């Protein structure tokens, strides 16, 4: 029976809200709350810039390890998805709370590594669970938009705390409490087993729009390209001359993610995923470059809107293409490209830490990130040109 007439469609709003909450907690807070917290912890003198960069890389390494671990079939048995998702959500909340102890550097690094594993679990188990209940593109867009909502919520939460002179320790404690409330909401909104739909094989197109390994390289470059800005934007924007803009810039990124997730999936349905991915990567590369104009408030606003509106769109478009490609053997391409993306994310902050300290390191790393995105866009452009030649 077509999914449009399947009873699950009556529950799509509930499922969309559930998916949004999954990534609001798992990614928006679990991963990206660290972005507005980094300048706070640095200003308190708890850690050096280099240490904070390695802590960021540790989180991405944990995410990479979690993506690899949870790609095994043993974790995807229907009876295990719900317990694993709730366990990942509980771990995310507890690990956020653990940051309030302000332990030594090595323990903070370990906490953020484990938080990365938990974030990967929430993304993988949450998205798999949703795909078992609906195939509606609105729900998939809502899932990814949760990242933006979490980013905006987390940044405004930190700003409100700083207004009342709260320490980073108190801010982490409050974030842990907020995570607990989200965990309760997730439990209440969990899709019922009886509404699961029949699994369908991945749709493979006869005309392969690109090789599977080329998509993996492209996505790895995108992971490296975006992560510098996603980690250090509030720190990079301190020279903008507008404290109000500097404070809310990361919120602007988060809010622009939401329409971006819906917009790119709509565009892909109309014009195709590969042309949209090409445009997405080009816009993202330009916006990453524009963040270097940190003394221009207007350019920072434009770059933040464009950056936020594209980087989660990259993920949704790559996942759409990956589901259409043939792969050798039993390779799980969705898991593999996520793995390569994770490697790119680790290398970004690690490179920043190795270059030097402060703004000079950020500028150099940002240029490298923009170059990686331009190369990814070039790969996509070449494949699009080849496809047009073949089909003409």
Swiss-Prot record:
Q: What's the short name of a Pfam family annotated to this entry?
A: MFS_4
Q: Name one GO cellular component term.
A: plasma membrane
Q: What is its main location?
A: membrane
Q: How does it sit in the membrane?
A: Multi-pass membrane protein
Q: Does the keyword Cell membrane apply?
A: yes
Q: What residues form the membrane-spanning segments? A: 13-33, 55-75, 91-111, 113-133, 138-158, 171-191, 209-229, 248-268, 273-293, 298-318, 331-351, 362-382
Any coiled-coil ranges, and where? none
- UniProt KW keywords: Cell membrane, Membrane, Transmembrane, Transmembrane helix
The organism's superkingdom is given as: Bacteria
Compartment annotation: Cell membrane
**Keyword Membrane found:** yes
Q: What is this protein called?
A: Uncharacterized protein YjiJ
Q: Which organism is it from?
A: Escherichia coli (strain K12)
């Amino acid at each position: 029976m077509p999914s449009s007439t399947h009873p699950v469609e009556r529950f799509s709003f509930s499922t969309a809200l559930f998916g949004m909450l999954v990534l609001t907690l798992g990614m928006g807070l679990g991963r990206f709350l660290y972005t507005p917290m980094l300048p706070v912890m640095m200003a308190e003198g708890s850690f050096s810039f280099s240490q904070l960069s390695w802590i960021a890389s540790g989180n991405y390494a944990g995410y990479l390890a979690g993506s690899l671990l949870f790609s095994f079939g043993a974790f995807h048995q229907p009876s295990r998805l719900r317990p694993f998702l709730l366990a990942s959500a509980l771990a995310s909340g507890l690990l956020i709370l653990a940051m309030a102890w302000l332990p030594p550097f090595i323990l903070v690094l370990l906490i953020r590594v484990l938080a990365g594993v938990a974030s990967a679990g929430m993304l993988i188990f949450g998205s798999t669970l949703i795909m078992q209940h609906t195939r509606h593109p609105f729900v998939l867009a809502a899932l990814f938009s949760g990242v933006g909502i979490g980013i905006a919520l987390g940044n405004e939460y930190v700003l409100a705390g700083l207004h009342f002179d709260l320490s980073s320790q108190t801010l982490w404690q409050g974030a842990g409490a907020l995570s607990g409330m989200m965990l309760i909401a997730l439990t209440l909104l969990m899709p019922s087993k009886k509404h699961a739909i029949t699994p369908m094989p991945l749709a493979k197109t006869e005309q392969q729009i690109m090789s599977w390994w080329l998509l993996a390289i492209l996505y790895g470059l995108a992971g490296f390209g975006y992560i510098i800005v996603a980690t250090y934007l509030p720190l990079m924007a301190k020279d903008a001359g507008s404290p109000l803009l500097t404070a809310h810039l990361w919120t602007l990124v988060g809010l622009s993610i939401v329409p971006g997730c819906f917009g790119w999936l709509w565009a892909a349905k109309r014009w195709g995923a590969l042309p949209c991915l090409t445009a997405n990567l080009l816009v993202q590369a330009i916006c990453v470059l524009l963040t270097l104009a940190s003394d221009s408030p207007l350019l920072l606003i434009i770059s933040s809107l464009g950056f936020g509106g594209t980087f989660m769109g990259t993920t949704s478009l790559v996942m759409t293409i990956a589901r259409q490609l043939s792969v050798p053997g039993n390779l799980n391409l969705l898991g593999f490209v996520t793995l390569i993306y994770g490697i790119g994310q680790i290398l970004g902050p690690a490179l920043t830490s190795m270059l030097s300290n402060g703004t000079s390191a950020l500028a150099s790393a940002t240029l490298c990130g923009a170059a990686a995105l331009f190369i990814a866009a070039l790969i996509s452009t070449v494949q699009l040109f080849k496809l047009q030649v073949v089909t003409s």
